[in-house]
UniProtKB/Swiss-Prot annotation:
It catalyses: guanosine(37) in tRNA + S-adenosyl-L-methionine = N(1)-methylguanosine(37) in tRNA + S-adenosyl-L-homocysteine + H(+). It comes from the Bacteria. This is tRNA (guanine-N(1)-)-methyltransferase. It comes from Thermotoga maritima (strain ATCC 43589 / DSM 3109 / JCM 10099 / NBRC 100826 / MSB8). Pfam families: tRNA_m1G_MT. PANTHER family: TRNA (GUANINE-N(1)-)-METHYLTRANSFERASE.
Length: 245
């Protein structure tokens, strides 16, 4: 997979490929992450990427020419990519979209700034994505969020078993996790986790995931198709509830 982020602040974005899982994926050649400075595709000595908007109004608008110059150069070199514009008007990013994008071979992400991008650029954009209903100063952080979430789902980046056990992949929030010490400030690790009984541990984890999801994200639970472990966990939770009555 190749991901190219187009921005006027390349130094801000470069760090994403220098740390952790993504850095290892880049080093191993599983993914290629490039950061392009949009100003390199300007032609004036001031490297101008914005201008006043027609019709008047507050704020500057990003000019179309640099985006088209980049795009045409890119297509000539690599072929047509899947182009994403980070935008508060886009569809809200989630795990399902991350899975969808992880199957793409070549992604370009345009980072918006100022009051927006000249509408004509939309003729080369395939998708608009937002990371939430709030306004940021630019599209760099959303581009990094999208890249991080997508890359870790690319086969070989993270162990498949780890991905399959994550929140959202199973349609449930994660169960509580603990590490040493066994007791801290009077709070103990649940004994079932020290039992060595893998079936009991798995059942406990699923019960806790269901409880947490029902409390915090009932929408996820309502959309989930229950498997056998889910049903066993719900029966066990009901029994525990009845015993307390």
């Amino acid at each position: 997979m190749r991901i190219t982020i187009v921005t006027i602040f390349p130094e801000m974005v470069e760090v994403i490929k220098k740390y952790g899982v993504i850095a290892r994926a880049v080093e191993r050649g599983i993914v290629e992450i490039n950061v392009e400075n949009l100003r390199d595709y300007t032609t004036d000595r001031h490297r101008t990427v914005d201008d006043y908007q027609y019709g008047g109004g507050y704020g500057m608008v990003m000019k179309p020419e640099p985006f088209f110059r980049f795009y045409e150069s890119y297509v000539e070199k690599y072929g047509k990519p899947y182009v994403i514009l980070t935008s508060p008007q886009g569809r809200i990013f989630n795990y399902k979209i991350a899975e969808e994008l992880s199957k793409k071979d070549d992604i370009v992400i345009f980072c918006g700034r100022y009051e927006g991008i000249d509408e004509r650029v939309m003729s080369i954009v395939d998708d608009e994505i937002s990371i939430g209903d709030y306004i940021l100063t630019g599209g760099e952080l959303p581009a990094m969020v999208i890249t991080d979430a997508v890359v870790r789902l690319v086969p070989g980046v993270v162990e498949r078993e780890s991905v399959e056990r994550e929140s959202f992949h199973q349609g449930l929030l994660d169960h509580p996790v603990y590490t040493r010490p066994y007791e801290y400030k009077g709070m103990k690790v649940p004994d079932v986790l020290l039992s060595g009984d893998h079936e009991k541990v798995e059942l406990w984890r699923r019960k806790e995931s269901i409880k947490k999801t029902l409390a915090k994200r009932p929408d996820l639970f309502l959309a989930k198709e229950l498997d056998e472990m889910d049903k066993l966990a719900i029966i066990e939770l009901f029994r525990e509830l009845m015993e307390k009555c």
